[in-house]
Amino acid sequence: MAFLKKSLFLVLFLGLVSLSICEEEKREEENEEVQEDDDQSEEKRGFLDVVKHVGKAVGKAALNAVNDLVNQGEQ
């Protein structure tokens, strides 16, 4: 009976250790995914900033061109 108890405790202990290791690996994978998502959102944010600046420049150029045409038409 004592042998059976020791075997059972050993099996439970090893199962608990393996479960703990699996949970730790799962947490690490989730953290890596979160970091990848953060990196991707930063890249998107950087891309949108570039698009915004280009849009402003194009808008200003178009506005200046329209103003020049209007001023030429008035003269």
UniProtKB/Swiss-Prot annotation:
Residues 23-43, 74-75 form a propeptide. Transmembrane segments: none annotated. Pfam families: FSAP_sig_propep. It comes from the Eukaryota. Residues 30-41 have a biased composition (Acidic residues). Residues 1-22 form the signal peptide. Keywords: Amidation, Amphibian defense peptide, Antimicrobial, Cleavage on pair of basic residues, Secreted, Signal. The modification Glutamine amide is found at Q72. Expressed by the skin glands. GO terms for cellular component: extracellular region. Residues 25-44 are annotated as: Disordered. One of its GO terms (biological process) is defense response. InterPro entries: Frog_antimicrobial_propeptide (IPR004275), FSAP (IPR016322). It is found in: Secreted. Its main location: secreted. Has antimicrobial activity. Belongs to the frog skin active peptide (FSAP) family. Cruzioseptin subfamily. This is Cruzioseptin-12.
